[in-house]
């Protein structure tokens, strides 16, 4: 055994000498791992390495940027100065002051996000910043290490319809929407309504509420009676009753 060890040692020394003579170092032959922590195995100390979460977060960012009209936004780019400083009678303060307070609320929501965070409903006319703030929350929550999924209501309804009539997909999109830590459901009211849409929407809302997974909804619908007429009292009650609602004021910011 000692003889074999000695032979291996001599072989190692000879190889090292040959490498040096060729102008290389031993480090030149080490694998170039993308992640030196787990050496590209994805596991470290019996748990998933942080590189796995980083990769998943990058993929989610790419998905959201491709699916949303604005891409991921940041709170810093939300310009409250663009809102009127004239007092809005319904508010008792100006839209600028109101939106500044709402911006601060959203910052705090994202910073303290957890399963106990409330559902949010952003309602108001087109171009008032609903999607911007929802996507800014998404960006910050992603950075906090949570899984975030974005979909427009129209895209959700279309995808769920395809899955319903394709028995090979096993409702994968619905499952993803149900399981994300935070779901952004944008532009409610633009989707094509069918009995299937109503049924699946109720299932999605109910499942997420029962499993304490927050959802942020945005919509141009500001009249609750219109909500009820469109989505049925059962769905509207489940959605509106479980949300902290914010109405957006001002004029279309995209026209300025």
PLM segments and residue spans:
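Walker A/P-loop nucleotide-binding motif
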Residues: 116-133
């Amino acid at each position: 055994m000692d003889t074999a060890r000695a032979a291996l040692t001599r072989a190692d020394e000879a190889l090292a000498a040959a490498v040096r003579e060729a102008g290389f170092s031993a480090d030149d032959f080490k694998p170039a791992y993308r992640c030196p922590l787990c050496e590209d195995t994805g596991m470290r100390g019996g748990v998933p390495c942080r590189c796995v979460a980083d990769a998943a977060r990058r993929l989610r960012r790419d998905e959201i940027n491709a699916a949303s009209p604005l891409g991921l936004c940041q709170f810093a780019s939300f310009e409250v100065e663009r809102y009127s400083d004239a007092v809005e009678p319904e508010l008792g303060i100006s839209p600028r002051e109101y939106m500044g307070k709402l911006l601060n609320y959203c910052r705090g929501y994202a910073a303290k996000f957890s399963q106990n965070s409330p559902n949010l409903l952003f309602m108001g006319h087109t171009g008032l910043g609903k999607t911007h703030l929802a996507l800014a929350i998404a960006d910050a929550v992603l950075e906090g290490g949570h899984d975030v999924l974005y979909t427009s209501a129209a895209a959700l309804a279309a995808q769920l319809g395809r899955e319903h009539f394709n028995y090979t997909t096993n409702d994968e999109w619905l499952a993803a929407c149900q399981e994300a830590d935070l779901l952004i459901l944008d532009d409610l009211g633009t989707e094509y309504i069918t009995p299937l849409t109503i049924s699946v929407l109720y299932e999605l809302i109910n499942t997420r509420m029962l499993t304490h997974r927050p959802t942020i909804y945005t919509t141009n619908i500001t009249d609750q009676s219109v909500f009820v007429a469109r989505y049925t009292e059962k769905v509207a009650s489940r959605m509106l009753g479980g949300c902290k609602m914010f109405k957006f004021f001002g004029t279309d910011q995209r026209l300025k």
